[in-house]
Amino acid sequence: MKRREFIRNTAAGLAALAAARPHSAKAENPKYKVAVIGRTGRGNYGHGLDVVWNNVEQAQVVAVADEDAKGRAAAAKRLNAPRAYADYRLMLEKERPEIVSVAPRWLDCHRDMVLACAESGCHVLLEKPMCQTLEQADEMVAALEKKNLKLAIAHQTRYSPTLQHARRLLMVLGTHVMDLMRLFAGDPQWCFARVRENGKPITRDDVRDGAEGIGPLAGDEIHVMYRFGEPTMGYFSTHRAKDGAAARFGLRLYGTKGVLTTTTGALPEVWFVEDPSWQPGRSKARWRRISSNGIDQPETRTDPGQSFGNRLIALDLIRAVETDTQPKGNVYDGRAALEMILAVYESHRLNAPASLPLKTRVHPLTLL
């Protein structure tokens, strides 16, 4: 090969490599350029997915986008963002951030915002749930995979130091066990569910548009059974809000040697009892607390405004970017959790167990 051809081909190869390489902090600028997308009045900024970056020293917020003028000005002030935009697409084009918080809580915008971020080559921190349908989720996964981009979804409990102790304990309790079920038990194989409204099975007439851009919704009573790997089963039941509903929300795991209960969040309340009968009232076995410091240790951490959990997610997203691995709660986990939810309606529609992954990618309620 001639010298001129060698130089030309080498330059072309380096250019292609640079284009394919995921964004990372440069030596001359160790801070990641972060942008925030919010939507005041229609999902706002989620559960603190904007201010989390104020507590991440490896990152610097360079801009915020919000279609609402007052909300935009307020966000720019609390984030110390030097620039603010009404159009998030224009912000992505002008600022070229490396990481973007897609913060609105409402789901009707998640798909479009994430696709725009992927097109601009940005990694994403996304408010949960992921989106409205599996069809949208598949599009998001494909767009991120195309450019080797990472997405972390704000399922805080996955990052909990408390649950790290709990997962180790499950081995002792003998457990071979929608996101927390998968965290402990893996992917479900099938789902069987019944959905009722006013005491009767739902029909097309019961389908309505859910609040906060959630998409189609139906039912005020849901009962679900999931089959995980042998011999593990999972059960989920819910009714329209009744007295004490918030206090009952959580997950309970039954193993051959005991029971573990947990709430959600980065610092959940976790208790376990070593009792093969699962009847501690009869056996007199004592419930024991698990904190982020371990078994029977007092909890010394706090999480005001969910800032502790959000920071864990943001730091793990940066770790994933730098190591070219997946975040603990990634785009595939977000899609799988959504699939478990939509499998409920698909099983009801079929009046039979629905195998997972679902073949139906549109919302099952639109097919009733």
Where are the model-predicted features located?
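C-terminal helix-rich "cap/oligomerization" subdomain common to oxidoreductases
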Residues: 7-29, 99, 302, 316-368
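Internal alpha/beta domain cores that form substrate/cofactor-binding pockets in large enzymes
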Residues: 33-35, 61-66, 70, 79-87, ...
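Active-site loop of classical SDR/Rossmann-like NAD(P)-dependent oxidoreductases
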Residues: 70, 302-314
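Contiguous beta-strand/loop segments that form the cofactor/metal-binding neighborhood of enzyme cores
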Residues: 172, 176-275, 311-327, 343-344, ...
